[in-house]
Amino acid sequence: MAKEKFDRSKSHVNVGTLGHVDHGKTTLTAAITTVLAKHGGGEARAYDQIDGAPEERERGITISTAHVEYETETRHYAHVDCPGHADYVKNMITGAAQMDGAILVVSAADGPMPQTREHILLSRNVGVPAFVVFLNKTDMVDDEELLELVEMEVRDLLTEYDFPGDDLPVIKGSALKALEGVAEYEERILELMAAVDEYIPTPERDKEKPFMMPVEDVFSITGRGTVATGRVERGEVKVGDEVEIIGLAEDASKTTVTGVEMFRKLLDYAEAGDNIGALLRGVSREDINRGQVLAKPGSITPHTNFKAEVYVLSKEEGGRHTPFFSNYRPQFYFRTTDVTGVIELPEGTEMVMPGDNIEMTVELISPIAIEDGTRFSIREGGRTVGSGVVSSIQK
């Protein structure tokens, strides 16, 4: 059977279902695929097809995630759903499943629960830009006032974590009834997807962002100059562009790209995803090192102090067997290099056990090009013991 051509005319958006255990995330995922399939937007997936998510390994961490896809009139969606709470935590911190926006599922019969709060906090810390709320199981609640109360609670909770709680869409429905084909509830699923279409912004694709390339290797070509190689992480670079060399030093230095090579061929420009060699004007072999980045001037700056959301690998995942405390000094692996850093745990937290997730403050011994949302691994003697994402820059 010939493979279908991927339709690029629609914008592509990554979403996921979040929320407390048993509030109906997987049922909703099944309902969305089923209802949209009736309207020609992909194929229906049954609950048990989604629930038996295969285990994946991302940065040495075991995560179960189900991936489904579906389409609306205007967009193509890739949707992730995780079976267990721990899978969400790991997924969001490692960035295994990128989310451009999330559908927060809250059972109208129970209201917001501890994991509802935790998923919202995590989303803020890892930079999920937008939420649409689905109040599920409304068929089990007869009292209209109670529904309004739950909606207010959810809105307040989102506001507490700096999301626009008063303005974001809240759709009421029943995923199970929609799955069973009850027309009134199928309508609510279409209403939900219309809200997702409208409210979750189309992400700026990597190609459109300011240029950045982590330096993997450096060598000099006699008579031509110094070449930095690496994979372009975002944006594009053209011959003649001015770039900054950032990280591992207090100040960034500027240079001009005088040549771009890929697979031994000369190019006029390179874009996100390309593995290239960039020839740099007036830069000596000693001026640039692995672990630095080439970037569009002014687009990213070097920092040493930041707050981060971190998942600590369990013993079974090959992590530490013992807890760690404040002043723990592991290596932080950013893009292509390790830098030593000191950890400070939040007030009232004495230690962190393997398998926990925690917000911590880090101070690196040398500055690295970082920004909110930059991901890293924590390593000890070459093995990964944690995975994290920068939630805010301190200095």
UniProtKB/Swiss-Prot annotation:
UniProt xrefs under CDD domains: EF_Tu, EFTU_II, EFTU_III
Superkingdom as given in the UniProt entry: Bacteria
Compartments (UniProt record): Cytoplasm
Keyword Magnesium included in the entry's annotation: yes
Catalysis performed (reactions): GTP + H2O = GDP + phosphate + H(+)
Annotated residues for binding of Mg(2+): 26
InterPro entries the record matches: EF-Tu_GTP-bd, EF-Tu_GTPase, EFTu-like_2, EFTU_2, G_TR_CS, P-loop_NTPase, Small_GTP-bd, T_Tr_GTP-bd_dom
GO cellular component: cytosol
Domain tr-type G: 10-204
Region (G2) residue spans: 60-64
Binding positions (GTP): 19-26, 81-85, 136-139
Principal EC category: hydrolase
Annotated spans, G4: 136-139
Subunit structure: Monomer.
Family to which the UniProt record says this protein belongs: Belongs to the TRAFAC class translation factor GTPase superfamily. Classic translation factor GTPase family. EF-Tu/EF-1A subfamily.
Protein name: Elongation factor Tu
